[in-house]
Amino acid sequence: MITWHDGDLRPLDVARLGDRYRRYRFTDPDAETAMAGSLRRYGQLSPLVVCLRDETHEVLDGFKRLAAARILGLNTLSCEPTMHR
């Protein structure tokens, strides 16, 4: 059982972050590439917002940051869990 508290920041493994809610967003490959440049240059400035669904951390906010991290081959990203349903 994973203990979560709203507002906690946790580093989570990029490979284990789910993106099933991404289908509700428009994607822009150029914006993802630009985000990768920003992430490389400045680091991660704000956490992804995630929720736990079926024992998977699903991204709710931060899809460009997740795509950029995958482009760069990063292992972890700072994430803020939320319990809102």
Task: Indicate where each model-derived feature is located.
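Basic, flexible Lys/Arg- and Gly-enriched helix-loop patches that mediate nucleic-acid binding at interfaces
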Residues: R85
